[in-house]
């Protein structure tokens, strides 16, 4: 599998937390999300790229489950300045 590129951009017009572009292997994620929501969105969109045949309901359930597990075990985004 080729690398997935992640691009942060405000997605207010799209009314979305994130978007996955399967053909280009690009995830767009709205950076205005708080910690756990950001993590869940990142996982959710990556699942869309990894498993394009998976239904939205399944992607949502599985991404929520994985995000909850990682969050419970203190996985966080570190911002380097």
Where do the model's predicted regions map?
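Catalytic zinc-binding patch centered on the HExxH motif and its immediate surroundings
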Residues: 1-28
């Amino acid at each position: 599998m080729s690398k997935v590129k992640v691009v942060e951009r405000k997605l207010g017009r799209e009314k979305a937390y994130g978007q996955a572009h399967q053909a280009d292997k690009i995830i767009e994620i709205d950076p205005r999300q708080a910690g756990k929501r950001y993590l869940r969105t990142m996982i959710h969109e990556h699942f869309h790229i990894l498993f394009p045949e998976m239904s939205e309901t399944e992607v949502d359930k599985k991404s929520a489950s994985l995000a909850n597990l990682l969050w419970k075990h203190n996985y966080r985004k570190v911002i380097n300045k």
